[in-house]
């Protein structure tokens, strides 16, 4: 039996698409190999948000070809969509596919051998329909990613993703419901709604008022699903109507990854973000008032072109003031073809590093404060895996990692836990 291995970089959308492509291979008789193991086919599902992700893809390609010189190396995803010629020029690569037509990957792999090179990348801007590649199987997991949307039309000045993913395309609501019902019947308890710009769901559907809230309401009625979670979302989503609605639905997790990028209005303007810090804070306050247990996490970019010490200080003070549960800190990485890449006053690497370290320290402090508020309180935790001798790891409804000890296997269960201690990036608790 032939083996296929996947190496996945980037966002939850990529994770979903990898699972879907793996299922296509398995239907054709392939067996899954682990990422670093010997395989007949290696599929690299790329990300191109930063130079680092590009480099990781190239390193893996070369490493795996050494492991099996006769293997077929297929590269798909955002990096291959925006730079197909660059990837095809890598000696070890056989097949280059972009961010569309992934349903054909097995068919394309079967057409070639390790001596051939083929690119099927087309103009993503011409693609108008959502590509359906659903997941049907059960694989022993309890939390499923569910891709409901693709594409982005926001064109932030630093971001390459609109060029890699194309225009907004929404998945048919009936298709979403069908897949969630299937996941529920296979034992999944939590569904994470993902997309490139989830808040834009429905805007491309002609003669329809369907929005993301309609998707959530439909899933909320599906028996067997106990949790609904959203992946990264934009501030524009959180209208009074949306906040009021989700605050009354028990299945909707009180956690939102609310993209910020900068806590300075001048920087946000250069980034072409469509909100101010005042508007962002109002949304945070609105969520906290409606959902007292809510956890809000975010992304922040340091060292954006033109970011002065004064601008960074504004970001730091803003983040210190609003005390978000967790933040992912990124050092700005120029992406060819974006407006920010040619802006004046690019920030030097050492300054980016220093600013990143300062925010990471603040991140630890903010998480500790949030964790302290959870001490001696009880939370429902979805346990996903064993992480040591009699130790199991899971997530609370508000997306805080919890570790407990148990003599019994508690994987794939939702159990009540009392929080007893705050550690760096996670909490310790005891089963109630």
What is each stretch, according to the model?
Residues 176, 193, 230, 258, ...:
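Conserved, mostly hydrophobic/aromatic
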Residues 73-74, 82-83, 87, 185-309:
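Conserved SAM/AdoMet-binding glycine-rich loop
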Residues 1-201, 217, 241, 256, ...:
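Proteins enriched for Cys/Gly/acidic motifs involved in redox and nucleic-acid/cofactor modification
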Residues 307, 323-324:
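Contiguous mid-protein beta-loop-alpha structural module that forms a pocket-lining wall or clamp
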Residues 48-49, 165-166, 205-208, 269-275, ...:
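Short glycine-enriched, charge-decorated loop/helix-capping segments at active-site entrances
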Residues 342-432:
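Terminal RNA-binding accessory module
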Residues 139-142, 152-154, 252, 262, ...:
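Short flexible coil/turn linkers enriched for glycine and charged/polar residues
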């Amino acid at each position: 039996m032939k083996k296929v291995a996947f190496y996945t970089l980037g966002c939850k959308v990529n994770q979903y698409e990898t699972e879907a492509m793996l299922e296509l291979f398995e239907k054709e008789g392939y067996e899954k190999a682990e990422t670093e193991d010997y395989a007949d086919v290696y599929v690299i599902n790329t990300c191109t948000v930063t130079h680092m992700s590009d480099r990781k893809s190239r390193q893996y390609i070369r490493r795996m070809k050494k492991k099996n010189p006769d293997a077929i190396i297929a590269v798909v995803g955002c990096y291959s969509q925006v730079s197909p010629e660059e990837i095809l020029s890598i000696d070890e690569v056989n097949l280059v596919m972009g961010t569309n037509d992934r349903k054909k990957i097995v068919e394309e792999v079967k057409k070639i051998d390790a001596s051939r090179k083929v690119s099927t990348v087309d103009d993503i801007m011409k693609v108008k329909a959502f590509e359906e590649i659903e997941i049907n199987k059960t694989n022993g997991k309890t939390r499923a990613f569910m891709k409901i949307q693709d594409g982005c039309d926001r064109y932030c000045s630093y971001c390459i993703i609109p060029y890699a993913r194309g225009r907004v395309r929404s998945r048919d609501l009936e298709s979403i419901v069908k897949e969630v019902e299937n996941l529920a019947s296979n034992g999944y308890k939590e569904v994470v709604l993902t997309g490139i710009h989830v808040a834009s769901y429905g805007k491309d559907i002609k003669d329809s008022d369907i929005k993301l809230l309609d998707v959530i309401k439909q899933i909320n009625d599906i028996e067997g699903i106990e949790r609904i979670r959203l992946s990264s979302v934009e501030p524009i989503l959180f209208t009074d109507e949306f906040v009021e609605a989700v605050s009354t639905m028990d299945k909707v997790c009180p956690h939102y990854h609310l993209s910020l990028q900068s806590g300075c209005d001048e920087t946000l303007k250069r980034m072409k973000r469509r909100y101010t810090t005042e508007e962002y804070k109002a949304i945070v306050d609105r969520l906290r008032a409606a959902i007292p247990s809510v956890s809000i996490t975010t992304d922040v970019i340091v060292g954006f072109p033109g970011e002065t010490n004064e601008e960074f200080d504004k970001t730091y003070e803003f983040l210190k003031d609003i005390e978000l549960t967790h933040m992912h800190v990124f050092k700005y990485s120029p992406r060819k073809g974006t407006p920010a890449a040619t802006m004046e006053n690019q920030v030097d690497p050492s300054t980016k590093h220093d600013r990143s370290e300062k925010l990471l320290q603040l991140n630890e402090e903010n998480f500790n404060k949030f964790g302290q508020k959870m001490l001696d309180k009880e939370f429902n935790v979805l346990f996903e895996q064993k992480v040591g001798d009699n130790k199991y790891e899971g997530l609370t409804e508000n997306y805080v990692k919890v570790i407990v000890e148990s003599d019994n296997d508690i994987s794939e269960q939702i159990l009540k836990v009392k929080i007893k201690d705050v550690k760096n990036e996670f909490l310790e608790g005891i089963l109630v």
